[in-house]
Amino acid sequence: MFKFVMVFAVLGLAAAVAPVSRSDDVHAEVKVLSSDVRADGFDTDLVVDNSIQQAASGDIHGNAHGSFSWISPEGEHVDIKYVADENGYQPVGAVLPTPPPIPEAIVRALAWLEAHPQAPEHGAHH
């Protein structure tokens, strides 16, 4: 009986310390890879069998938009969409940090300053 318990204890310990891998990212295979580059823009697509995906399109003016996604180590689906244009790179996604709200005292101070513009000084030399 003691040997029986010891065998199961060793097997349980081995199972507990064995590395668990959701996927083998090193050996991931590309399922889709396409690229279409034209005089008026481009389109690209990438799909990998480990849940990584990427798509992008661009136009003749240098603007681009697209998306990329993957599964985080915590198992969360991460999805980022973006636009890149004259206003810069603008990503959007639930996992991206957002700035904290402006404190109420600052909001009130800004509203007061807007409601009470400073009068120009007479006689000031510029």
UniProtKB/Swiss-Prot annotation:
Residues 1-16 form the signal peptide. Keywords: Cuticle, Signal. One of its GO terms (molecular function) is structural constituent of chitin-based larval cuticle. InterPro entries: CHIT_BIND_RR_consensus, Cuticle_Struct_Prot, Insect_cuticle. GO terms for cellular component: chitin-based extracellular matrix. Component of the larval cuticle. This is Larval cuticle protein 2. It comes from Drosophila miranda. Residues 39-100 form the Chitin-binding type R&R domain. It comes from the Eukaryota. Pfam families: Chitin_bind_4 (PF00379). The gene is Lcp2. The lineage of its organism: Eukaryota, Metazoa, Ecdysozoa, Arthropoda, Hexapoda.
